[in-house]
Amino acid sequence: MVSDRSCIGYLRSVIAGSVDTHTGHECTITNHAAEEGGGTAAAAAVKVMTVSGSGKRGRYVRQVTGRHNDTDLHVAARGGDAGALRRALDEAAAAVATGEGREALEEVRRAVAAEPNEAGETPLVAAAERGHLEVVRELLRHLDAEGVAAKNRSGYDALHVAAREGRHAVVQEMLLHNRLLAKTFGPANTSPLISAATRGHTEVVKLLLELDDFGLVEMAKDNGKNSLHFAARQGHVEIVKALLEKDPQLARRNDKKGQTALHMAVKGTNCDVLRALVDADPAIVMLPDKNGNTALHVATRKKRAEIVAVLLRLPDTHVNALTRDHKTAYDIAEALPLCEESSEIKDILSQHGALRSRELNQPRDELRKTVTEIKKDVHTQLEQTRKTNKNVHGIAKELRKLHREGINNATNSVTVVAVLFATVAFAAIFTVPGGNANNGVAVVVQAASFRIFFIFNAIALFTSLAVVVVQITVVRGETKSERKVVEVINKLMWLASVCTTISFIASCYIVLGRHFQWAALLVSLIGGITMAGVLGTMTYYVVKSKRMRKIRKKEKMSRRSGSSSWYDNTELSETELNQVYAL
């Protein structure tokens, strides 16, 4: 019989191997039992790892303990001892890959780190379950994608276990390592989001919901229930709100029994979950399952008096809705065993007009329901029409305001320009081209160009002054009158501009004289073409604008008399598409 001490020494021994010429690396794991009678160490197990390669072959013998034959890496991972785990990996690599390169050492570490116990649990799963972040980080450094995604015999991988246990930091670290881990499935097609939502781990759920491109919120188990079903059933209101914020239509999804999340919520006792679901979609309160049960029927059968009271306060709840068995909620309440909850539920139902199925007058109820629906539809349409009229009135008011502001800006601009024209014209008469004689008379007073300059400069001066007088005299307030005034003063400003141009051309002839006649002609040509082009274009748009207004006025009159033609409508639509306004 071998003593305990010698047996333990044997378990920790390192046995060197012989030279092997095989290429590549092959990993073999063998379990041995060291049973030597009834000693305590005789029940221990040994794991021997052999790695063959281009260098030496080594065998690393490690002690395994516990019910599932955990290795020393499992023990370190469960205890959160990152240092011990690091030393165990280094010892295994040094023992097995003796004399080989760095890649061989890392391959040994990868194989040792991914080694499961008899329950199929890797050290990463053990560390993730207990939330040891440093150990998880250390293991992720050595594991490949297959090792990270390894599942235990229950069908859960490390990320799934961490999400189920609410290890937010571990889940975040593993998602940073590989986002695709969030799409793995456990038993019965359970996703990590479903496990976290069922356990009520809000932070983990919000973290998983950030992965928008994976569609995690749409994933459901084999029975058709998604994460909202389970969160609602367990009464996790914050998770329910987070899921509905992500996808409000999730409230209408049903499982294979036809149950929505509201059916699951009324089986619990949390009224806040019920309110959150109804706020997202009020119509779900009357959605039936495959047996015709609404949320009210389920809550009554589960004897949830408070839930029944909340449901009956909702406007969309039909207290006498029938199941496929032609039973109302009151029929279900009467069939319950006599107790305080069932009596309270019957009282609540009676207060809201609940009846037995045999007491229902189906034609009368159907007619009443139809009339009610028509009234609701009419009320909705009237309300919508009122809102539309209000919006149109607001838009029209805003347009009038903008129109008035545009006219005010135009009048202010015209006033400034008119003052400028008047100033230039007034100053020009005292700085006569060619100068003055000693008696103050202009030297070129007999020239025709001077007479042209003098006359048109005076017209420009008095026209501009007239515009200024009109602008400072007219009282603001009437948009239509202001528009007419602006049209008149704009024409006066056109006249002032033309006169100023002619005055400038005439002064050019005075100053340049006969020696530079070509320069005066060039100035005349430039000024004439510019003013003629601008005024001609503006005249075209003014005429076009007036024509468009006449067409619209004619169309309005024809609509009132009911004699509008297809041709008029076509012409109007074309003018409305090409509106150009000119004052």
From Swiss-Prot:
<feature type="repeat" description="ANK 2">
    <location>
        <begin position="119"/>
        <end position="148"/>
    </location>
</feature>
<feature type="repeat" description="ANK 1">
    <location>
        <begin position="68"/>
        <end position="97"/>
    </location>
</feature>
<comment type="function">
    <text>Involved in salt stress tolerance.</text>
</comment>
<keyword id="KW-0677">Repeat</keyword>
<dbReference type="InterPro" id="IPR002110">
    <property type="entry name" value="Ankyrin_rpt"/>
</dbReference>
<feature type="repeat" description="ANK 4">
    <location>
        <begin position="188"/>
        <end position="218"/>
    </location>
</feature>
<feature type="repeat" description="ANK 7">
    <location>
        <begin position="291"/>
        <end position="321"/>
    </location>
</feature>
<dbReference type="GO" id="GO:0005886">
    <property type="term" value="C:plasma membrane"/>
</dbReference>
<protein>
    <recommendedName>
        <fullName>Ankyrin repeat-containing protein NPR4</fullName>
    </recommendedName>
</protein>
<feature type="transmembrane region" description="Helical">
    <location>
        <begin position="414"/>
        <end position="434"/>
    </location>
</feature>
<feature type="repeat" description="ANK 5">
    <location>
        <begin position="223"/>
        <end position="252"/>
    </location>
</feature>
<keyword id="KW-1003">Cell membrane</keyword>
<keyword id="KW-0472">Membrane</keyword>
<feature type="transmembrane region" description="Helical">
    <location>
        <begin position="518"/>
        <end position="538"/>
    </location>
</feature>
<dbReference type="InterPro" id="IPR026961">
    <property type="entry name" value="PGG_dom"/>
</dbReference>
<feature type="transmembrane region" description="Helical">
    <location>
        <begin position="452"/>
        <end position="472"/>
    </location>
</feature>
<feature type="transmembrane region" description="Helical">
    <location>
        <begin position="492"/>
        <end position="512"/>
    </location>
</feature>
<feature type="repeat" description="ANK 6">
    <location>
        <begin position="257"/>
        <end position="286"/>
    </location>
</feature>
<keyword id="KW-0812">Transmembrane</keyword>
<keyword id="KW-1133">Transmembrane helix</keyword>
<dbReference type="Pfam" id="PF13962">
    <property type="entry name" value="PGG"/>
</dbReference>
<keyword id="KW-0346">Stress response</keyword>
<dbReference type="InterPro" id="IPR036770">
    <property type="entry name" value="Ankyrin_rpt-contain_sf"/>
</dbReference>
<feature type="repeat" description="ANK 3">
    <location>
        <begin position="154"/>
        <end position="183"/>
    </location>
</feature>
<dbReference type="Pfam" id="PF12796">
    <property type="entry name" value="Ank_2"/>
</dbReference>
<keyword id="KW-0040">ANK repeat</keyword>
